[in-house]
Amino acid sequence: MAFQEILESLGGMGRYQVIHVVLLSLPVFMLASHNLMQNFTAATPSHHCRINGTYEETNFTGPWLRALLPMTPTGEFSKCLRYTTPQYELLENNLTQSYDDLETEPCLDGWVYDHSEFASTIITQWDLVCNHRRMRQVAQSIYMAGVLVGSILFGGLSDKFGRRPLNIWSNLQMFVTGICAAFSPNYIWYCIFRFLTGVAFSGIVLNSYSLTVEWIPTGNRAFTSTATGYCYTMGQLVLVGLAFIIRDWQWLQLAASIPFFFYFLYSWWIPESGRWLVLSGKPEVACKALKKVAQINGKKEAGEKLTVEILKSSMQREINASHNSTYSALDLVRTPVVRRISFCISCTWFSTSFAYYGLALDLQSFGVSIYIIQIIFGTVDIPAKFISYFITTYVGRRVSQAITLILAGIAILVNISVPQDFQTVRTAMAVFGKGCLAASFNCLYLYTGELYPTVIRQTGMGLGAMMARLGGIIAPLAQMTGDIYHSLPLIIFGCLPILSGIAGCFLPETLGVPLPETIEEVESPDKQQKDVNVSAKIPLKETELYNMKTDV
C-alpha cells in the first residue's frame, strides 16, 4: 500500500482530507431523496369517478355519493366505477350497499382526487389509477433500471477516463434530468428522465466513493466510510422535511434536483484520484496534486521532497499488477468454492435489496401518516447499522448475515396474519424488518469483500451490486401480485430473505481470517498459513471502505 504511505507522510487525515470528505458527502443527502422520492411524488390519494352535474366534487364522505357510486365488498365507495344513472332509491331505502344488477360504467370523465394531503402527484397529473395503477410501480422500476445501467456504464468509464470528470458529469446530469422530470409533458417522458436520473445516481455513488477512499489513509476509512454511510440515512429525513413542506410533486422534484447544480460547480475543485493518475500513466499530474494536498495539510516541506521518480518507484508493484491482470468475471464461477460463494452471495444481495425496497417504497399500505412512517423508517437504520457493526465484529459475519435476513423475513411474514386495524403492530413489524435489512446491507459490503480473493474482489463486489440493483428493479413489480392475492407481495418479500439467510449459512466465516490474495487460497483454505491468529479488525480495515455505500 505504497500510495497510502505517501498520504500518511503528507499529513494523513489532514485538513484537505476533511474538506474532501465533506464535499463528496453532501450529495449523498439528496441521493436518498431521489431514491425514495416516489413515496411522495407518486402517492395515490383517495379518489373516485368524476360525476357530471352540480355535485360537490371535493366531498369524499357525503351521503349523496351512495346514489352515484357502487360500493365494494369492504364497504368503501368504488374508485373505478360509477352508476350509469343516479340511483336515488338507494338513499331513500337507506341501504348500505348497491344492488348487484344495477348498471355501472368506468370513469369516462376522469377522476376526482382528495388534495387534502397532496396538492399534486404524478398519479393525479396523469390519472395513474384503476387500469393504469400499475404504471406507478413501473416508473420506479424504470428508475432502478437506470441505476443498474449506470453502475455498469460508469464502472468501466471511470477506470478509463478517471473519477473526477465522470463525477462532474454525473452531478450535472442529475441536475438537468431531475429538472426535466419535473416539467415532463407526459408519463413516458417522465420515465425517460427518471431513467437518466438513475444512471446519474450510480455515477455519483461510484465516482464519489472512489474519490473518497483513494484520498483517505487506511486507518481513517472506518470513521469516514461510516459517517458517509449515515449521510444517506439522514438524507431520508431530509426527504421527509422537504415533502412535508412541499406538497406539489413538481416543486418537490425541483427541490431535490437543484442542489446538484451547486455540487456540480464545486466538483471542479475536487482533484482526480492520485492513485488512478499514477496507474494511468500520469505520475506528473499525480505528483502535482499530492504537493497541493501537502500544502493544504501544512506539510509543504514533505511535499517539496516528493518527486515523480519517488512516486513511481513507491507504486511500482501496483503499476505492474494493473498491467498484468488476466482475471475476468468467469473466475467467479470457474472453481467450486468460489462458485458456491458467488451463488450464495448473489442470493443474499438480491433478496436484501428486493425486500428492502419492497418495504421502503410501499409506505401508504401501513395506514398511518406517510411522513411519520418515513421518519421511523429512516431513523431505524441508525441503531440497526450500529448493532450490525458489533455483531459482525465480535460474533461473526456469517451469523450476522443469516440472522438479519431470517429475522427480516419472519417480521414481514408475521404481518400477513396481523389485521389491518392493528396499525401499530403492523408498523412495528415492518420497521423491525426494515432495520434488519439495513443491518444486512451493512454486513454484506464487508462480508463480500472478505469472501473474494484480492485478484477478483472488485469483480465480486460488482456482481453483488448488480444483483442488488436487480432486486430494486423487481421489488416494485412484485407489488403488482397483490392483484392476484392481497397477501402475495408480503409472502414473496418474506420468503426470499429467509431462503437467502439459509443459503448464507453455507458461506465460510471470515471473522479473524486473513484476506485471501488468490483463488487458490479460497479453494484450499488449509494451505493459507498467513498468521491465522490475526485480529478480526485486520480484514475489517481492508474492506471497511465498502460500508460507505450501504443502502445506496
Curated annotation (Swiss-Prot):
Post-translational modification: Glycosylated. Glycosylation is necessary for proper targeting of the transporter to the plasma membrane.
Subcellular location: Cell membrane; Basolateral cell membrane; Basal cell membrane
GO cellular component labels: basal plasma membrane; basolateral plasma membrane
Principal subcellular localisation of the protein: membrane
SUPFAM superfamilies: MFS general substrate transporter
Membrane topology according to the record: Multi-pass membrane protein
Cytoplasmic side: 1-16, 159-164, 207-225, 272-336, 379-398, 448-459, 509-552
Residues annotated as transmembrane: 17-37, 138-158, 165-184, 186-206, 226-246, 251-271, 337-356, 358-378, 399-419, 427-447, 460-480, 488-508
Record key words, sorted: Cell membrane, Membrane, Transmembrane, Transmembrane helix
Function: Involved in the renal elimination of endogenous and exogenous organic anions. Mediates the sodium-independent uptake of p-aminohippurate (PAH), cidofovir, adefovir, 9-(2-phosphonylmethoxyethyl) guanine (PMEG), 9-(2-phosphonylmethoxyethyl) diaminopurine (PMEDAP) and edaravone sulfate. PAH uptake is inhibited by furosemide, steviol, phorbol 12-myristate 13-acetate (PMA), calcium ionophore A23187, benzylpenicillin, furosemide, indomethacin, bumetamide, losartan, probenecid, phenol red, urate, and alpha-ketoglutarate.
UniProt name for this protein: Solute carrier family 22 member 6-B
Organism: Xenopus laevis (African clawed frog)
Gene that this sequence comes from: slc22a6-b
